[in-house]
Amino acid sequence: MCVSRFSKIVPVALLLALSACATPPSHINDICAVFEQRDGWFDNWQDSAKKTEQKYGIPVHVLMATVRKESGFKGNARPKRTKLFGFIPWTRVSSAYGYSQALNGTWSQYQRETGNFTARRTKFADAVDFVGWYHSKTVSNYGVAPDDTFRLYLAYYHGWGGFKRGNWTPEIQKYARDTDDMARRYQVQLRSCGG
């Protein structure tokens, strides 16, 4: 009888555990749909983004447009692998990983400076906090306005050294314009879902 009861509890527990895992939102161009997403039962994406805005002064629409451009809201996103001899999967072009596509070194710097040593790039709340931290350092060190998505994204993509040099390719400027356009759309959409 105990075995029978246990065999019924295990599948239910597994189902509940799996239902708590986040899947990427299917409508990433609609911030209200994105904000219906949760990491587990308790971590609400909208609450996490608002907390980050309050902490660092970077508007929610800027934060979310950056995450959208970097990972498409996929928590396990990584750069594609290069190919050896044109067909054998080889190394990745960078160590970028997670929602924020933070590089290993920059993520370590974030953890040291914030004291958040348990932060994970695959957890949305941690990743959006990283984006806020990074953008706020760009604001304070380079005089970029907190709502200047175009310039914030250029610094995010190139790193602070590349941003300071200012030699951005037309392709990267297009990425930054696209991110700025998305931020503007998100800003308008936020009015209808409590942003």
Regions found by a protein language model. Name each.
Residues 23-195:
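Catalytic glycan-binding domains that act on GlcNAc-containing polysaccharides
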Residues 9, 22-23:
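Selective for proline/serine-rich intrinsically disordered segments
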Residues 1-10:
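Bacterial N-terminal signal peptides that target proteins for export
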